[in-house]
Amino acid sequence: MNHFPWLTIIVVLPIFAGSLIFFLPHRGNRVIFWYTICISILELLLTTYAFCYHFQSDDPLIQLVEDYKWIDFFDFHWRLGIDGLSIGPILLTGFITTLATLAARPVTRDARLFHFLMLVMYSGQIGLFSCRDLLLFFLMWEFELIPVYLLLSMWGGKKRLYSATKFILYTAGGSVFLLMGALGIGLYGSNEPTFNLEILANQSYPVALERIFYIGFFIAFAVKLPIIPLHTWLPDTHGEAHYSTCMLLAGILLKMGAYGLVRINMELLSHAHSLFSPWLMIVGAMQIIYAASTSLGQRNLKKRIAYSSVSHMGFLIIGIGSITDIGLDGALLQIISHGFIGAALFFLAGTTYDRIRLVYLDEMGGIAIPMPKIFTMFSIFSMASLALPGMSGFVTEFIVFFGLITSPKYLLMAKILIPFVMAIGIILTPIYSLSMSRQMFYGYKIFNAPNSYFLDSGPRELFLSISIFLPILGIGLYPDFVLSLSVDKVEVILSNSFDR
């Protein structure tokens, strides 16, 4: 066990420091904004330091372990630890949350509560990625929903209450299955209940019961990922939310579902996963085509980007279903890659709306001339989204594609049909992406508006965009920097789990 509680400090610091926001002197929103920025940067630096000096990337075992007994009655522990699967999402969470806080500077209404909720969300996400107790996993899963619901319902568009209600109904409904599965696994087959993921990973179940557990967990994670047909909350939520909230939703929240699918469904229920993996491949391929086709018909800019996120999650599902080292590595890399790309696109969509006050694509046009910097940045991130070689999107899709081709589990016909469907999705992506850019930036429609003078992006927007672009380019040119964090853990998951 680690003697210094690094992870506990990292999890608790944002919410503890955030609670002090309400005691800051009333000297305007600037003090609150810079205080939140400093806390976010401090948290990111602390996380980076702990991982650089106390984490061994070539060790697949759980590291920085902390285990404190919380409720003795049913063996509930505050049990934390990280490995190759969790270090990437944790660092992504710190990076995106810091940038989303910087993006939230225009927020002036109830600024104290807004920034407090962002820090609470920060703690919940870090806690979920670092917990090693199944019941604690559920508590973090639920705890993180509260600030998201309040951020959606209080800041956003005219239909924000509708979208927030839809979000909480979907996610709370999925959480019921997560709780039932956690209690079922924790209480099964032993005199003393345990929720320790280390013990549960070595436990075996009857085939029928394991399938039931798998389906329950899958429904919970499918809502958050999201997987069709449980995705309909996402476009409405993104369409109404403030863009800093959208950055957190697209960059981190969706990845929680993918993380749970690997951490619980693959690690704990490996036999059932091998049985259901062909269906995952089919669902992933259908999702790529369906979401890309639906995105093309969206008038709302943010809803079009939201459907593109759903489409890209299809590649992640296929990587998880391939049951190969390469495919799972590609899926984990897609978690990081899309976290950056999705956050960047929603940020630029939000800054564009702040300037022109238009959200429907058929009302836009000609923005490239008055706002060339935003045009350039949006074009670059659109290229990253459609998997331009040299950027992270291309690498992740290629690795997932290669992982499917080399999988020994599937017949030749499946290795032909699924990549064929994936290729159609890859063709559809530039169609809706370039169509979006054409409607926004070309033509003369915007000059007919009463106020045809618009400010281009300032230093804050440029800094944010460059900060997100550099990791996208870095992963695209040298993906092994990220893959090296998880490659040993992926090998252990597949060798230990599927050879039992």
UniProtKB/Swiss-Prot annotation:
**Secretion signal, residue range per the UniProt entry:** none
Q: What organism does the UniProt record list as the source?
A: Jasminum nudiflorum
Q: Which family does it belong to?
A: Belongs to the complex I subunit 4 family.
Query: Which protein is depicted?
Result: NAD(P)H-quinone oxidoreductase chain 4, chloroplastic
| Pfam families, sorted | Proton_antipo_M
State any single GO MF term.
Answer: ubiquinone binding
UniProt lineage: Eukaryota, Viridiplantae, Streptophyta, Embryophyta, Tracheophyta
Record's bilayer topology term = Multi-pass membrane protein
Which InterPro entries does the UniProt record give? NADH_Q_OxRdtase_chain4 (IPR022997), NADH_Q_OxRdtase_chainM/4 (IPR010227), NADH_UbQ_OxRdtase (IPR003918), ND/Mrp_TM (IPR001750)
What domain of life? Answer: Eukaryota
List locations, semicolon-separated: Plastid, Chloroplast thylakoid membrane
The protein's UniProt keywords, in alphabetical order, are:
Chloroplast, Membrane, NAD, NADP, Plastid, Plastoquinone, Quinone, Thylakoid, Translocase, Transmembrane, Transmembrane helix
Q: Which residues cross the membrane?
A: 4-24, 31-51, 84-104, 111-131, 134-154, 167-187, 212-232, 242-262, 272-292, 308-328, 330-350, 386-406, 411-431, 462-482
**Gene that this sequence comes from:** ndhD
